[in-house]
Swiss-Prot record:
One of its GO terms (biological process) is asparaginyl-tRNA aminoacylation. This is Asparagine--tRNA ligase. InterPro entries: Aa-tRNA-synt_II, aa-tRNA-synth_II, aa-tRNA-synth_II/BPL/LPL, Asn-tRNA-ligase, Asp/Asn-tRNA-synth_IIb, NA-bd_OB-fold, NA-bd_OB_tRNA. GO terms for cellular component: cytoplasm. Homodimer. Its EC number is 6.1.1.22. The keyword Membrane does not apply. One of its GO terms (molecular function) is asparagine-tRNA ligase activity. Keywords: Aminoacyl-tRNA synthetase, ATP-binding, Cytoplasm, Ligase, Nucleotide-binding, Protein biosynthesis. The gene is asnS. It comes from the Bacteria.
């Protein structure tokens, strides 16, 4: 008799009526009377537990089993009984239960519901709850979706370095890397990467279509529901691409990911629809069945001015060209005005990074942010400045010394046939929040790192 997994039983139980099976796993709950007991049994291969029925008359260790602490590991030998009239499609009538590992009674995740903060304090255990089992399953499939998209579209996967000598965003929010035995280990200042973009740009000149996917680090002291100190970014880069084609690529990429989740994580999405965000399935269908609008930054400013005049309450009410849009403004645009993801394009140069291509008006850059309801910005991209002189001028305007900041190599790319390039950075956890209905980014990553917290 071979060991079988719940995942396989869910697919084949109707053909296994009366068949003897062996399962190994733990239980989420147990209840018993004097003669019969019921175990909610899980082996981590499926979301919902299987009911194990055990009786005193044929279970010599009935009393021991009945008193086992939650999360104890057991081996169950029993018979498959289909139960179409009950909530669960089948159950296992046990003939033998062996205790493999008894859990300590102090196990924190008892049968009662637990709050999000409590679960964050027990991040090493929270994957055993339905919520985090579902979110992390979707996270895995979401990553697979992007790999499939880029593979199908002939992108090369580039492993960008995690230790760098520059801050590609120029925001001064990088973590410094220092060897305790040799402070001058690299011969220059070293930092954890804030973006894989520069490496992607270099490789796009050799392979045309590339992408990076890895962790990035920001030394921000933000305590919001959308910020982490360590998070994952998807950063494609395509040579010869302009801003218009870039928005098309972003839209195709996001829609492919959602289609993929419908194919490979539909039960998990349905769980999220029932437990995290009612209407989630309809929202995602609306995303894949409609175009993402494109709206100019200048038009956004006029929309916001009109909203203020009509009495809409923003915390930041001084709406003017050149302002950096706040989350409240972004969400108003995508939630109240367009009611779906929307591209804002051609931002003022003073609120965007130095490497973005200057438009002919000399005021704006060929940049875009994709704004999503409930989240705000989930993706930012741009056409890159391809003129060496313009890029150097922009650096000097922002007091960025290419030599001092180890950026000369990046500028030098423009000397050697760098005609045009565009790319974007998509916050993986933010998109995961959007497709699951998860309301805090700290719950969209296995072990969250943020200011003041490093427990695991």
């Amino acid at each position: 008799m071979q060991l079988i997994e719940i995942k396989e039983l869910l697919l084949s139980h109707s053909k296994r009526e009366g068949e003897q099976v062996v399962l190994v796993g733990s239980f989420k709950s147990i209840r018993s009377s004097g003669a019969i007991g019921f175990i909610a049994f899980s082996d981590s291969t499926a979301l919902e537990p299987v009911q194990i029925v055990f009786k005193k008359e044929n279970t010599p260790n009935f009393d021991e089993i009945s008193k086992l602490p939650i999360s104890s590991m057991i081996l169950v030998k029993g018979v498959v009984r289909n139960t179409p009239e009950k909530k669960q499609p089948f159950e296992i009538q046990a003939s033998k239960i062996v205790v493999l590992k008894e859990a300590d009674p102090s196990y924190p995740l008892q049968k009662k519901a637990h709050g999000s903060e409590f679960l964050r304090e027990n991040a090493h255990l929270r994957v055993r709850t339905n919520k985090f089992y579902v979110i992390m399953k979707i996270r895995s499939e979401l990553a697979n979706a992007f790999f499939e998209f880029f593979k199908n579209n002939d992108f090369l996967y580039v492993h960008a370095p995690l230790i760098t000598s520059n801050d590609s965003e120029g925001a001064g929010e990088s973590f410094e890397v220092i060897s305790p035995n040799d402070p001058n280990y690299f011969g220059k200042k070293a930092s954890l990467t804030v973006s894989g973009q520069f490496a992607a740009e270099a490789y796009a000149q050799g392979f045309k279509r590339v992408f990076t996917f890895g962790p990035t680090f920001r030394a921000e002291k933000s305590h919001t529901s959308k910020h982490l100190s360590e998070f994952w970014m998807i950063e494609p880069e395509v040579s010869l691409m302009d801003l218009d084609k870039l928005t098309i690529l972003i839209e195709q990429c996001v829609k492919h990911a959602i289609y993929y989740l419908f194919d490979y994580a539909k039960p998990e999405l349905e769980w999220c629809n029932e437990n995290l965000e009612p209407g989630l399935i309809d929202k995602l269908n609306n995303v894949i069945n409609n175009d993402f609008p494109r709206v100019e930054y200048r038009e956004v400013i006029e929309i916001l001015k009109k909203a203020v005049a009509e009495g809409v309450e923003f915390e930041v009410k001084d709406i003017h060209f050149g302002m950096d849009l706040k989350s409240e403004h972004e969400r108003y645009i995508c939630e109240k005005v367009f009611k779906r993801p929307v591209f804002v394009i051609n931002y003022p140069k003073d609120v965007k990074a130095f490497y973005m291509k200057l438009n002919d008006d000399n005021q704006t850059v060929a940049a875009t942010d994709l704004l999503a309801p409930g989240i705000g910005e989930i993706c930012g991209g741009s056409q890159r400045e391809d003129s060496y002189n313009k890029l150097l001028t922009r650096c000097l305007e922002l007091d960025i010394d290419p030599e001092f900041n180890n950026l000369q190599w990046y500028l030098d790319l423009r000397k050697y046939g760098y005609y045009r390039s565009a790319g974007f950075g998509l916050g993986f956890e933010r998109l995961l929040m959007y497709v699951t209905g998860c309301d805090n980014i700290r719950d969209a990553i296995p072990f969250p790192r943020f200011h003041g917290q490093l427990d695991f």
